[in-house]
């Protein structure tokens, strides 16, 4: 008959098992960390940066009913803001509008504010007045000069879609959502899972007053996606009427990528609003705002020039890992570019660090 002997662990063996478990725990933690990457979204105000963020959010799945309702209210709020801006321009520059129309449209703006308070419910009569307002010749004249008073590109989109927005069961589409304009203050974050890698996307407010907050995130970034509106080469900043927007974008890009920060981060540059740029170069000369420009006033020559402008002032180390694309952030096609570029950059980052 065999004797079953009990196996007794010595104190030394117990300590070793404890150490092994701790090592395994740390390895598992490290493995999880390896599958997380942080992407910073930087750029000046109104460049389309937050629209890129919304496209990334759309890539993660559908919005909840609550989120859709919140965005419906924001659309009504945007319509109110756009209407007030247009009406103010008409009054300031004494464009031709009857006193009766002025009074009716003032009441319309007040009713829009009430619609925002009452969960985005728009009376049919209010929608009809909005359509009439948009068709008014003085308002259209003001809209044609929108670049001078910083009216966003989304105004026309929402006014053109009043018949759909006014419906009781209206739910915003992804195209509606990417057209919503709410200035980013502070830092907005969204998680995106891409090829089993968790990306933390951080959208940092682009106005000058918000930029001091950027530095808190610089050490954490694995990649930086900088968005600049190429179509704004002839426009001034909303917060500084003396400064050209594209000059500001280029200087900001040079400052961020001067070699002091982001020692290992990849650089992604989106020259955004390429659709508006295509229209603008038909009647606005790049050379009038950038005397260095010597090429033909075409989309091709213009984009080549601005690519060089951004690239020439950054630290040499960044030039080796810089990816540049022309984009239209409001188009769903930009999701393909985002997916391809981000995936390439992150995979390269992980290979460089031996994580994959």
UniProtKB/Swiss-Prot annotation:
Mg(2+) binds at residues 50, 184. Residues 176-184 are annotated as: G2 motif. A lipid is attached at residue 4 (S-palmitoyl cysteine). Transmembrane segments: none annotated. Keywords: GTP-binding, Lipoprotein, Magnesium, Metal-binding, Myristate, Nucleotide-binding, Palmitate, Transducer. GTP binds at residues 43-50, 178-184, 203-207, 272-275, 329. One of its GO terms (cellular component) is heterotrimeric G-protein complex. Pfam families: G-alpha. GO terms for molecular function: G protein-coupled receptor binding; G-protein beta/gamma-subunit complex binding; GTP binding; GTPase activity; metal ion binding. One of its GO terms (biological process) is adenylate cyclase-modulating G protein-coupled receptor signaling pathway. Residues 38-51 are annotated as: G1 motif. Belongs to the G-alpha family. G proteins are composed of 3 units; alpha, beta and gamma. The alpha chain contains the guanine nucleotide binding site. This is Guanine nucleotide-binding protein alpha-10 subunit. The gene is gpa-10.
């Amino acid at each position: 008959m065999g004797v079953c002997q009990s196996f007794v662990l010595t104190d030394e063996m117990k300590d070793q098992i404890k150490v092994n478990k701790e090592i395994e725990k740390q390895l598992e933690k490290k493995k999880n960390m390896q599958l997380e990457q942080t992407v910073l979204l930087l750029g000046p105000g109104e460049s389309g940066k937050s629209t890129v963020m919304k496209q990334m959010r759309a890539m993660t799945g559908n919005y909840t009913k609550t989120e859709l309702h919140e965005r419906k209210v924001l659309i009504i709020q945007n319509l109110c803001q756009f209407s007030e801006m247009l009406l103010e321009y008409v009054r300031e520059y004494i464009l031709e509008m009857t006193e009766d129309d002025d009074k009716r449209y003032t009441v319309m703006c007040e009713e829009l504010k009430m619609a925002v308070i009452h969960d985005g419910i728009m009376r049919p009569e209010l929608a009809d007045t909005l359509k009439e307002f948009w068709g008014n010749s003085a308002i259209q004249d003001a809209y044609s000069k929108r670049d001078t008073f910083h009216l966003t590109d989304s105004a026309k989109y929402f006014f053109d879609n009043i018949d759909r927005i006014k419906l009781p069961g209206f739910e915003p589409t992804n195209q509606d959502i990417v057209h919503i304009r709410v200035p980013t203050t502070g830092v907005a974050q969204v998680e995106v899972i891409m090829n089993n890698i968790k990306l933390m996307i951080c959208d940092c407010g682009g106005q000058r007053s918000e930029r001091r907050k950027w530095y808190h995130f610089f050490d954490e970034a694995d990649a930086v996606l900088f968005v600049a509106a190429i179509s704004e080469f002839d426009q001034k900043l909303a917060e500084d009427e003396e400064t050209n927007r594209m000059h500001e974008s280029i200087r900001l890009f040079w400052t961020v990528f001067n070699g002091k920060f982001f020692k290992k981060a990849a650089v992604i540059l989106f020259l955004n609003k390429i659709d508006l740029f295509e229209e603008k170069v038909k009647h606005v000369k790049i050379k009038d705002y950038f005397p260095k420009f010597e090429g033909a006033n075409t989309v091709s020559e213009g984009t080549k020039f601005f690519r060089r402008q951004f690239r020439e002032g950054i630290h040499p180390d960044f030039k080796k890992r810089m990816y540049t694309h022309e984009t239209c952030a409001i188009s769903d096609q930009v999701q393909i570019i985002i997916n391809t570029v981000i995936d390439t950059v992150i995979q390269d980052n992980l290979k460089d660090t031996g994580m994959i």
